[in-house]
A protein has these predicted regions:
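An amphipathic alpha-helical core segment
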Residues: 18-28, 40, 45, 51-53, ...
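Flexible, glycine-rich surface segments
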Residues: 54-158
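A surface/extracellular/periplasmic glyco- and lipid-processing/surface-interacting theme
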Residues: 10-86, 90
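Short, small-residue-biased leader/transition segments that mark boundaries at the very start
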Residues: 1-6
Length: 184
């Protein structure tokens, strides 16, 4: 099945592959159905009563464990630590593989495509956009976690925490951009 992902294929080659391989088509359809289900579920929850529940559990005095803000920040940290840092970089490089520290290049994202770094950079950029309240289809800085940090006066040393985080993310993107693909 890996022949489908090789980067020299055209769009038509990909369509032909899925249309002529029942298992691949089933997998693709299942992925699309899953994305559609969860997108609609989240939209329904946020346009329903969950938005009010989230807000009522998110006052500046209520950032303790179990609060909406705490859960949001912990989820963001998990995403960065486990999905991006560990999953996309650390495991393939052997940094998180127990005592062996064995390099496992086959664990990189898009192994057969031979380009995984653009996906690492895009993941980090998406995280930055999320923090700064930037929609996936806009470059406008809307209300985000950065505004909450400013509202509660979150600081590291004498710098605003949101500025420190954004600077660190920019540095991560710069450093990842200095790596060479393929990581595999």
């Amino acid at each position: 099945g890996s022949e489908m992902c090789i980067r020299d294929r055209t769009n038509e080659d990909h369509v032909t592959y899925f249309m002529s391989n029942a298992n691949a088509l089933t997998y693709l359809t299942d992925v699309i159905d899953n994305i559609n289900y969860w997108s609609n579920y989240i939209l329904t929850e946020w346009t329903g009563s969950y938005k009010d529940s989230f807000k009522s559990n998110s006052t500046s005095e209520s950032n303790a464990q179990g609060s909406s803000i705490s859960n949001l920040v912990n989820g963001l940290c998990y995403h960065y630590e486990s999905i991006i840092r560990k999953g996309k970089i650390g495991l393939p490089l052997g940094a998180f593989n127990g005592f062996s520290q064995q390099i496992e290049p086959d664990l990189v994202e898009c192994y057969y495509h031979q380009e995984s770094l653009p996906f690492v950079i895009e993941s980090v950029n998406a995280m930055k956009k999320y923090i700064n309240g930037i929609s996936f289809n806009s470059s406008e800085n809307g209300l985000g976690l950065d505004n909450y940090m400013t509202h509660v006066g979150a600081m590291q040393n004498s710098n605003s925490l949101s500025s420190v985080i954004n600077s660190q993310i920019d540095e991560i993107i710069e450093k990842v951009g200095q790596l060479n693909d393929p990581l595999s």
